[in-house]
Every structure is written in structure tokens, then in C-alpha cells.
Amino acid sequence: MNPIQPIPKSKIEIRIKCKDLTSKDLLSQSDPQAIVYLKQQQRNDWIQQGKTEKLKNQKSPEFKQSITVDYHFEEVQLLKIVVIDIDKDIKLLKDFDDHDLIGEVNVSLGSILSSPGGRMKMSLTKNGILSGSITISTEEIRETGANIYFALEGNHLDKKDLLSSDPYFKIYKSGGTLVYQSDVIKNTLNPTFPPVYLKLEELNGGDMFRELTFEFMDWDKIGDHDLIGRFTTNTDTILRGGALEFEIINPKKVGKSGYKNSGIIKFYIARIQGDPTFLDYLHGGLEINLMVAIDCTASNMPPDVSTSLHYNTPTQPSQYASSIAAVGNVLAPYDYDQMIEVVGFGGLYNGHTSHCFPFNLTNGDDNKSEAHGLQEVLDIYYNNVLKIPFSYPTNFENVIHHAIKRASKSTQSNQKYTVLLIITDGDISDTQKTIDELVSASKSALSVVIIGVGNYHFEAMKILDGDEKGLVDSKGNPSKRDICQFVPFNDFKNYPEALAHETLKEIPSQVLSFMKLSKIHPNQPRQFNC
């Protein structure tokens, strides 16, 4: 017998709800969030396993975001669950202080799993004083590798407000575990809800016939939300297709004279599908925007000198122009309006060194830094590079910060992703500030590709790439995902197609990582009109 065999393990889904939390604020309820830590026995340390979403003004929150942990029967797995009210991102226990804490509990995973229904209710305490209760639900995840996608609409829902209702719905799997909560649709009795996209095991634990309860509520700004009605079904029924309709019933109205239902719910899409691909997002209308940032520091040499990296001739474009053309030719077709922003950094602008300024100096309007199409980008570059006084140092912080603001507009209905192309001739002098911005940018719909021109060694750029070691900002926060790619121009200077390939090859996976992080799924494919 081989004593070093892989130890079987299961994945356990943990869901949390709390009741009667004490408030940290005198005039309002807390904005709670739960974080789950697992004790690392060898290091006697607590490692974060995951966290729920933050809920606004909730005394008794029921969190919809679950946390997944690996289960090892042969180990004592001690969990610490903390409920906090804090705005900043939390990774380590030391990242919050006593003032941020609402309450906490320590419990072994085995104790919860062996409780009836895999569920345990406990007291939350802070410094030994009761601060509420917590119910922890666990369930083994039977991974199917499949996802369920469905969409529904309501008709003639009950009026809960003076003129209408503000409906939303929750999905519970048997045992009363919340697995999904929709957005609120304001002022309507005939809502069309955004499509639902879930891992199949999240919805039903891998059991196609497990009972699901759809509960429809009317949102109220103040006070408890009102029940409109509910119905029960299972995944198998939802997927049968056709015009599947359900009556939603309010139990308090059953038996009253003339009562039939509180509305009709219709599923108009329902299907099983694998993980979405990059093309799924493109077909659903994803737009990829390009932003170009050009190094205007003095180390490039004056652009009218033949040794300058910005020196252009009719037969030999500069490495900057070649880089713009190589990357732009690939990305331009994915940009529907063909508007490409062009900025400079490290040059004099309005008499002062600027690390992010509009490259087009001829129009005199800071809001007109965009070019229409790739050729106009090159025209702006050729027409303005001789007019910009070069300065120093080389800093990326401002350019990336500007790109983050541009890229922060991607939503489920309006899917956009920005690729920032930075072309530079040397290392930066603001490495840590740039890393801080890249870590911040990892939460946005943004990728950063850096092309290094000239013969510099670019050691700092290899750090920014982050392939060997993930980026961590100055506060200890790790990057949410890999978004930066560095490529030296000289490795591909005679092969523009290869330069574009090497520069952009990670973009599809980076788009997918952002969509997964943001829980944005592909929209329905756009229809071709003859």
C-alpha cells in the first residue's frame, strides 16, 4: 500500500444568516458582512476562505454569497466567522480593529456538518457580550461542471404600494437556504428580470429534482419588505422548455373570496450550458475599447534627431508607431464606435510636467483626446510628437488611474472592456504607486499591455507583469486577477503580427476573469438583420 496517496476531500458550501445584530451606529443599522477564516494548524494562523457581500442597513441579514471550503474528515478544521461593519477590503484578521467588529464565533467544521441538516445556530459575541445570533448552513457540493441560465418575467403581480410594486425575487433550495436574489425592478406589476446565471450545484446541489422555492417580494425603502407570493418547482421542470408558467400564491390570501393568485411568472429562457467563452461575450455585444499612452520623456531623445525612438520617416516608422499599428489593427474591429483615446505622459503640458495629458494639442480641448479609427491615432501621433517638449521622469500611476475611471462602466446590459496600451522606453520611477494602481485596476474592466521600445533592460516592467509573483499593493491587498502583460519590442521588431500576438494573447482570459469576478454573464447573441 502506498502511504502517500491523495487524501479524498469534499467541497463544502457555507451559507450564513444573522439575527438581531447590535448596531454600531446610534442613528442607523449596521452594514454587515461576514468573513470566514480557517485555522492553519501548522502555522497557528487564520487564513481567509471567503466572504459574503455587504448588506446595507440590515439588522438580520441573510447573505446570498456562499463560501466554499475543502473538507478533510481526518483533520480538526476550526473556523472563525466574523461579522463586521467596515468599508475597506479585508484580507487578514489584523486588517480590522475592535471598533469594526459586530461579533464573532469559533466552531469546527465537523461540528456543523454533524448537526441536524448540517446547520447550526450559535450566539455571536464581542468581548464576551452577546451581539446577535448566527445560523451557519453547510452542504456538500457535487460539482457538475455545468451552469444553468434562465430568465423570467411576471404579469399582473399584486399591487403592494399606492400605484404599483417594486418586485424582486429570491430562490431557496430545500432546507430554506437562500441561493439567489434578483435586482429590484421599480414601479411595475409586469417585471422582466435580468437573466439568472448560476453553477448548477449552487442552485440544487447536483439534484435536478430538488425542490426550489421562488419567493417574490415588494421592496420598501423603509421597514420590512412585503411578500407578494411564492411557488415551488425543481430544476428538471424549469428546463422542460415551452411556455412554462407558474401562479404565485400568497398564503395569507388563500381561502379569501375571489382569490386566484398574486400574479403569473413565465420562464422564457431556460438551458444548461458550460462555462461561458470569450466568444459568448463578443456575440452578446461585448465592446473592447483601446486607449493608447505614449512616453514623452527626454530619454527618448528629441523626435527630430535620427537616433530618437520617436524618429519617423516615410519608409521607416518609429517603434512607437509600429507598436500602435500592430496592436491597433487587432483591437480596432472590436470597438464599435472606433473612438480611441490617445494620451501622453512625461512631457510638458501647459508649462508643467504632466504624467497624463491629451496627445492631440491642435484642438485645445482636454475633452477631445479621442481619435476616430487607427489611422487618426497615427495621424495625431505624427502631427503632435514634434510639438511636445519632452521632460522626466517616467511614471505610470496617473495614466493607469485615468484608465480605471474610463473602464469602470461595464455592466450586465452594457458590457465594455478597455485595453490600455502603454509604450515606453525605460523603467518607471513610481513602481510601488504603479503597483497600487494595477491592484486597484484588477477590480475594473481593464487590461494593461506595456510595450518596451529601445534597448533598455526593463527590470521593473517584468515585476509589473506579475506572472512569476502576484502583485500586492502597499496596504497588503493582493491583485484580484492578472491584468498586466509586458513585451519588449526588439524581440518582435521585424514581425508585427507576432508582436500583436504576444502582447494581446492574454486578453481573452483576462476578460473572462473580470466577468467571473463581477458575476456578469454573456447577453443573448445579437441578431443579424439582412
From Swiss-Prot:
It holds the Pfam family Copine. Signal peptide: none annotated. Ca(2+) 1 binds at residues 25, 31, 85, 87. Gene3D superfamilies: C2 domain, von Willebrand factor, type A domain. Its cofactor is Ca(2+). Residues 289-507 form the VWFA domain. GO terms for cellular component: cytosol; plasma membrane. PROSITE patterns: C2, VWFA. One of its GO terms (biological process) is cellular response to calcium ion. Keywords: Calcium, Metal-binding, Repeat. One of its GO terms (molecular function) is calcium-dependent phospholipid binding. Residues 1-122, 130-248 form the C2 domain. Ca(2+) 2 binds at residues 25, 85, 87, 100. Belongs to the copine family. PANTHER family: COPINE, COPINE-B-RELATED. This is Copine-D. It comes from Dictyostelium discoideum.
